[in-house]
């Protein structure tokens, strides 16, 4: 998280740290007593046995509870080149349970109305400056940052200028024309909260999530 501040798992008990070969590389969010939602580009092509997730801890690399996985379900229409439909469900091999620091998140439904310029919060354990490598991740305390939703047409035109396509399945956020706040390497797959509800792209996938989680 760039431009944010330290937070705690008590403030965001649905956060999950995704571990590849026991090393934090992505974020996720608890959605029920067995599943974590993340981005498909995180586990795509990997063996299920290479992944675990940690819940209930402010620290990405210690504390809380670590779960092995029974399966990883990537969205069937995920496109690894355009990152369209970039969503995945990691199912734990055992029940996650709940506590003050472990809670499933509420997920925006298909009728959730998220306007432009709305305050949203991104959370994660990733790099705190642009260009931070995996080896330099702070990996200590969870961080959060306040950003804002960006108009879809504005976002699409900005990305088109650098040869990237923004689809209707994507949600844009940041600090438009100011910058300095955002998610970064290692935050991929983590939640974007609007009034404590996970929004990001999930409102377009609610039925798929419910069917597979």
Swiss-Prot record:
Source organism, top-level taxon: Eukaryota
UniProt key word Disulfide bond: yes
Major localisation: secreted
Disulphides: 26-42, 155-172
Keywords carried by this UniProt record: Disulfide bond, Fibrinolytic toxin, Hemostasis impairing toxin, Hydrolase, Protease, Secreted, Serine protease, Toxin
Gene3D superfamilies xref list: Trypsin-like serine proteases (2.40.10.10)
Tissue-by-tissue expression: Hemolymph and saliva of the larval form (caterpillar).
Protein name, as recorded: Achelase-1
Originating species: Lonomia achelous (Giant silkworm moth)
């Amino acid at each position: 998280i760039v431009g944010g501040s330290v937070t705690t798992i008590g403030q965001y008990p649905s956060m999950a740290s995704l571990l590849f070969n026991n090393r934090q590389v992505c974020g996720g969010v608890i959605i029920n007593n067995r599943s974590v939602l993340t981005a498909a580009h995180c586990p795509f092509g990997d063996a299920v046995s290479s992944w675990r997730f940690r819940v209930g801890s402010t620290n990405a690399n210690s504390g809380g509870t670590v779960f092995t996985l029974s399966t990883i379900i990537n969205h069937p229409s995920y496109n690894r080149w355009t990152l369209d439909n970039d969503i995945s469900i990691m199912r734990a091999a055992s029940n996650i349970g709940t506590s003050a620091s472990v809670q499933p998140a509420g997920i925006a439904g298909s009728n959730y109305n998220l306007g432009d310029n709305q305050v949203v919060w991104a959370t994660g354990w990733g790099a705190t400056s642009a260009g931070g490598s995996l080896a330099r991740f702070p990996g200590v305390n969870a961080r959060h940052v306040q950003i804002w939703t960006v108009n879809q047409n504005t976002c699409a035109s900005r990305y088109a200028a650098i040869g990237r396509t923004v689809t209707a399945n994507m949600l844009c956020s940041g600090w438009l024309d100011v910058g300095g706040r955002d998610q970064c390497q290692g935050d991929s797959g983590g939640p974007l909260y609007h009034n404590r509800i996970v929004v990001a792209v999930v409102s377009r996938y609610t039925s798929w999530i419910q069917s597979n989680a």
